[in-house]
């Protein structure tokens, strides 16, 4: 029987993580459970930095970006001896289960703890929207609004100077954030990690647009596809049009979460408590067709693939 649980946030922060923590804490307390907040992710778990949370611990956090528990990269967690210390710390504190909020790397940590006999539930918290088993991740919609605002502002200055603007968007190997922002922002060109990219082909498309009378353009590109500064130099050289690259960077992770992220995080947090009380461990929570779902965390990490929104890209191309 579950009586006391821990909750931590891990990996890159995402707007809505605080709402998720609040959902976990409030739902657990309603069911008569005790909750301990673990500071700075798996590193804090290893260092035994945790404290009991009550209803007031999560008051006035639903609107705050980031995570008040903190987060940290902790590669040492791959070491089984380090993980054993974490398990011993949780057992000494009387914890029966752990809720982990983060991306696929955080899920891997939860998987390893589950394999050591400690039940964990994973909640998808990342702006990249790259976690399998869920339509959307906590933080994605807030980041989308942040990127869209930046694109709108870039369009203002690009049109004034008849300039080509490249905007680099986060996402790692997933282009969901770039694609959605590009459609909403009316970007003329989209470069995604899921689609083979050729700078030469992009230049041809830009030149075709110029021949049709296009006086400015915005190229939305996901990070890590290429060096955007070098791409800007190449485009300017080949087209004769002033071209500038803007890397949005970590600004995409910040800010007060939008309504949908707050609702999603609250639902997922509460649902994690339902699963634990039903005896589940080694599961990850998702939302599919607006319904809460859960999957085996090993399956989500190793076997499930996020579907590429090819139909969205087809739509975007029709609108250029």
Curated annotation (Swiss-Prot):
- Acetylation found in the keyword field: no
Q: Where does ATP bind?
A: 12, 73-74, 103-106
- Reactions mediated catalytically: beta-D-fructose 6-phosphate + ATP = beta-D-fructose 1,6-bisphosphate + ADP + H(+)
Could you list this entry's UniProt keywords, alphabetically sorted: Allosteric enzyme, ATP-binding, Cytoplasm, Glycolysis, Kinase, Magnesium, Metal-binding, Nucleotide-binding, Transferase
Main localization category: cytoplasm
Q: Where in the cell is it found?
A: Cytoplasm
List the Gene3D superfamilies hit by this protein, alphabetically.
Answer: 3.40.50.450, Phosphofructokinase domain (3.40.50.460)
What is the enzyme's class at the highest EC level? transferase
Q: Where does ADP bind?
A: 22-26, 55-60, 155, 186-188, 212, 214-216
The record's annotation in CDD domains points to:
Bacterial_PFK (cd00763)
Assembly, in brief, is: Homotetramer.
The record, for PANTHER family, names: ATP-DEPENDENT 6-PHOSPHOFRUCTOKINASE (PTHR13697:SF4), PHOSPHOFRUCTOKINASE (PTHR13697)
Entry protein name: ATP-dependent 6-phosphofructokinase
Q: Which organism is it from?
A: Pectobacterium carotovorum subsp. carotovorum (strain PC1)
